[in-house]
């Protein structure tokens, strides 16, 4: 299968997590048969037009290691054209590219809202079944996954726990940069790795790269209001402990770790979450699922 992956070129919005994570996975799976067009410079470690410190999340996790470039960017014998951000950031269809798709034009919808803007598409904030719309979500590169280690825990929750997860205000958009605690990505991961729990919650949408980073760090993810998330919406079928109140959270913290030692219930959940991450939540498996759907729907 050969794909042209149409990218967003707005220099002020280069690190769209859905676009970047899927491109990472597709390149890993398809290699030279996934051509980013135009070439997505930040994926290759080129931040000359979009400085890393100005990117969403400072490029942590998804831009740690440059992806390998393709050897041939000739746009021919193409099966699919996929728009990496659908119609966000002013992206419009390119008729001269669309006509190259022998098997169809698809869209990757990373909008935080549940509205369907173009089909056929893959959508992370999918609230109910819709014709020609298929669930997807963020992913994290396999190289970012740390070993599980229960012996190095020194704190209950991570320093970067969002205020809303502890029943404070929901802080979104550029204002959320005030919540960035670490300048160094490894320090960010080490903090989660040394925490018994990683608290998370809904942001602009239900899916958040934070979920995957907590899982990758080897901390036990606790998800505020996960039981209220629509089933088809990412992260789908994630094993986790959820809580709806401050008392729920206190009860979980005291029940799962006793005298600074993990209970069997805690241990079992951490390993279940790691299995989910490896089978459902990496950039590679997200890309594999996308390719499977394309082949099933267009035979």
Residue spans of the language-model regions?
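Short amphipathic alpha-helices within nucleic acid-binding modules
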Residues: 252
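Conserved acidic donor-binding segment of nucleotide-sugar-dependent glycosyltransferases
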Residues: 239-247, 256-260
């Amino acid at each position: 299968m050969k794909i042209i992956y149409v990218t967003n070129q707005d220099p002020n919005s280069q690190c769209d997590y859905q676009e970047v994570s899927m491109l990472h996975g597709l390149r890993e799976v398809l290699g030279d048969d996934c051509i980013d067009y135009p070439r997505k410079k930040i994926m290759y470690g080129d931040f000359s037009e979009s400085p890393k410190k100005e990117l969403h999340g400072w490029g942590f996790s998804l831009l740690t290691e440059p992806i390998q470039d393709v050897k041939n960017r000739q746009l021919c014998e193409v099966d699919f054209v996929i728009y990496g951000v659908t119609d966000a950031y002013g992206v419009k269809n390119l008729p001269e590219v669309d006509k190259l798709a022998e098997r169809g034009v698809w869209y990757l919808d990373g909008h935080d809202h549940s509205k369907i803007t173009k089909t056929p598409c893959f959508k992370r904030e999918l609230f109910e079944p819709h014709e020609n719309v298929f669930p997807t979500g963020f992913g994290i590169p396999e190289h970012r996954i740390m070993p599980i280690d229960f012996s190095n825990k020194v704190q209950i929750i991570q320093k970067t726990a969002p205020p809303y997860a502890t029943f404070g205000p929901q802080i979104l958009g550029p204002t959320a940069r005030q919540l960035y605690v670490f300048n160094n990505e490894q320090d960010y991961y080490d903090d989660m790795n040394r925490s018994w729990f990683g608290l998370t919650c809904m942001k602009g949408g239900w899916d958040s790269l934070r979920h995957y980073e907590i899982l990758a760090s080897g901390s036990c993810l606790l998800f505020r209001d996960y039981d209220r998330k629509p089933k088809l919406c990412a992260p789908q079928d994630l094993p986790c402990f959820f809580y709806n109140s401050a008392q729920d959270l206190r009860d979980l913290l005291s029940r799962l770790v006793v005298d600074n030692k993990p209970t069997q219930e805690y241990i079992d959940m951490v390993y279940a979450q790691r299995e989910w991450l490896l089978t459902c939540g990496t950039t590679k498996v997200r890309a594999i699922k996308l390719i499977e759907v394309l082949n099933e729907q267009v035979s």
